[in-house]
């Protein structure tokens, strides 16, 4: 067989292979991409005390990347600047930033990185993950209510409760009795900016 026919045959085979692979590559790249609207989102906390202490974090970032359109492939990443704590009281904020609590000089970030997503029912989703504060990492759970399914925009609002003493926060604030249980409230609003809709199982 002439050499040019062998070369043409090889080129044709490579072309066919490329044509067959390109659609799958394109599909693999099609995942939902969401952007969080910081202006309308909040991360808050409260702890029962002789007077309940409530506060927010003014500086934080959150992402929700997907590896497919299936909700359970999402990964929730939250990074909070601990020094941005805001209770409305300079004395309390200073105490919380100090070494007895957040210890922001040594460990400036509070983070949550999800490792598993479970749909509980049509409106409730649990994110199991690693929670880190003061350089101590432990497994915790964020339980969210999901709204706006199928609209391209929505909200996930959830809570996580942890024992502050598990993370080395054993002391209190002068003249204030503080409970051990701390509740974190995460309210994220965002929209899908590209990719297919998220697929929910329920």
Predicted regions mapped to residue ranges:
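Low-complexity, acidic/polar, glycine-enriched regions of mature
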Residues: 27-202
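Polar helix-capping/helix-linker motif
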Residues: 7-8, 21, 70, 98
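Bacterial N-terminal signal peptides that target proteins for export
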Residues: 2-14
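Bacterial N-terminal signal peptides
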Residues: 11-24
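Exposed, low-complexity/repetitive linear segments and helix-based recognition motifs
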Residues: 6, 26-27
């Amino acid at each position: 067989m002439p050499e040019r026919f062998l070369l043409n045959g090889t080129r044709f085979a490579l072309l066919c292979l490329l044509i067959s692979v390109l659609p799958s590559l394109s599909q693999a790249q099609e995942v939902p991409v969401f952007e969080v609207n910081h202006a309308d989102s909040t991360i808050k906390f409260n702890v029962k005390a002789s007077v309940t202490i409530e506060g927010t974090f003014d500086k934080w970032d959150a992402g929700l990347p997907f590896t497919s359109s299936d909700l359970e492939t999402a990964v929730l990443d939250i990074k909070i600047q601990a020094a941005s704590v805001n209770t409305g009281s300079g004395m309390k904020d200073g105490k919380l930033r100090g070494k007895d609590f957040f210890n922001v000089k040594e460990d400036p970030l509070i983070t949550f990185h999800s490792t598993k997503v479970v749909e509980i029912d049509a409106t409730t989703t649990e994110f199991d993950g690693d929670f880190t504060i003061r350089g101590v990492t432990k497994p915790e759970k964020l339980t969210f209510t999901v709204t706006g399914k199928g609209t391209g925009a929505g909200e996930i609002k959830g809570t996580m409760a942890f024992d502050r003493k598990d993370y080395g926060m054993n002391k209190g604030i002068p003249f204030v009795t503080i409970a051990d249980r701390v509740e974190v409230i995460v309210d994220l609003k965002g929209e899908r900016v590209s990719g297919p809709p998220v697929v929910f199982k329920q």
